[in-house]
Amino acid sequence: MSLTMADGVEAAAGRSKRQNSLLRKQLALAVRSVQWSYAIFWSSSLTQPGVLEWGEGCYNGDMKKRKKSYESHYKYGLQKSKELRKLYLSMLEGDSGTTVSTTHDNLNDDDDNCHSTSMMLSPDDLSDEEWYYLVSMSYVFSPSQCLPGRASATGETIWLCNAQYAENKLFSRSLLARSASIQTVVCFPYLGGVIELGVTELISEDHNLLRNIKSCLMEISAHQDNDDEKKMEIKISEEKHQLPLGISDEDLHYKRTISTVLNYSADRSGKNDKNIRHRQPNIVTSEPGSSFLRWKQCEQQVSGFVQKKKSQNVLRKILHDVPLMHTKRMFPSQNSGLNQDDPSDRRKENEKFSVLRTMVPTVNEVDKESILNNTIKYLQELEARVEELESCMGSVNFVERQRKTTENLNDSVLIEETSGNYDDSTKIDDNSGETEQVTVFRDKTHLRVKLKETEVVIEVRCSYRDYIVADIMETLSNLHMDAFSVRSHTLNKFLTLNLKAKFRGAAVASVGMIKRELRRVIGDLF
């Protein structure tokens, strides 16, 4: 009896392996026949009835060439699909620096011990399409959810164009498809599950194309079924000869079913034990060595929410990290400072600091830290001056101070003897005793600045000196202004200047700043 059970388990294991191998070949042949990017078989979950999860897949996209090229693209596609699956399971275990040892050989699916050449597959080596294919492995779909769920519930084929722009309710991987340039996705029911195919091109619905895909799937399935039936008949006849008396066909069917379940559960627990615990947090094994799981009916809805949340977390991490991998940049946690990666942002920042340096008169340093420190000090000084002025507004001291300031301005006059603009006064000549008329020219220095949007009107009246107009023009240029109208004249060594200018660029100086810079040029008379 023990020999019979062992033979049943071995037979079930062989059937499971052949079925997976057959399904991979079917998907590979179908996706290669139409030259699409990938094919996925979403199978029914054994732990959650009605839920679709990853069953098998075949990647046929533009794979990145690593160290060598391969003659058979078909066989290389099968091997690449296995490598991506292994990489996903390794990443799911929590190893952020995952590298998977891969093998490339004659790719005989029935014999895994053939001679091979070992290579290392890292997440850094994946293209956008390969990332799309890998992240899709983490998705599960409840009944009528997204394309696979709807195709399974309705039993109809769903053809989606412009998948990268589809709503999240219809196609939850639309954002991921946009980064991978996946434009067309097709889903149709098959063997109790759903087959999904995708391509980076925009292809309208074509019934002939669907018939071609389904015929490729059925062609391999028909040949394999004939071989399986012959092998099954031989195996059953052998088992019947080994059965002891008193065991019926129903007992044999029961034992064969149990063997199949045990083999499938053991296979999944050995390979994807951590994956199952991660994806099904509400399912707990009855004991460490058991192949069965217990579940609670009330926790199924919560489990669905956790599945969706986990998929979104994986998608968010991929979308955030993959662009940094391809551009060979450091991760944000390793960067220090602001705007180190973008030259345009750094240039704009330097321009703003240059404008800030010109606006603060006491700043002569070049480094940004000194500019900011001096700017803070200057603002504190201005704040103190404003508080002082507000405190003395309306007081007697303020009125007296204002009167003295006016007197000081009136004392800044230019007295010159001339034939016009004079006051009647007398000057006594000590030698002759005669009196003569003297012209006293009185006027005060005047400065007026009027700002309207980007145009500035400046009126200056002050004592004349050499190159004073050139100095004024240079000051305006340092303030990022260009003069377009200048009128000036000099009378009795007194300059009158009317000037109009416009600002260059977006930086606009204040009226107070313009007056302060012009006062330096005019001199102490103001």
UniProtKB/Swiss-Prot annotation:
InterPro entries the UniProt entry points to: bHLH-TF_ACT-like_plant, bHLH_dom, HLH_DNA-bd_sf, MYC/MYB_N, MYC1-like_bHLH
Molecular function terms, GO-annotated: DNA binding; protein dimerization activity
Cellular localisation: Nucleus
Biased composition (Polar residues): 332-341
Organs and tissues of expression: Mostly expressed in developing seeds. Also detected in stems and leaves.
GO CC field: nucleus
bHLH domain segment(s): 333-382
Keywords: Activator, DNA-binding, Nucleus, Transcription, Transcription regulation
Location, primary (coarse class): nucleus
Induction behaviour: By cold, UV, flagellin, jasmonic acid (JA), and salicylic acid (SA) treatments.
Entries under SMART domains matching the protein: HLH
Function: Trancsription activator, when associated with MYB75/PAP1 or MYB90/PAP2.
Known partners and oligomeric status: Homodimer. Interacts with MYB75/PAP1, MYB90/PAP2, MYB4, MYB5, MYB6, MYB23, MYB82, MYB113, MYB114, TT2, MYB0/GL1, and MYB66/WER.
UniProt protein name: Transcription factor MYC1
Species of the source: Arabidopsis thaliana
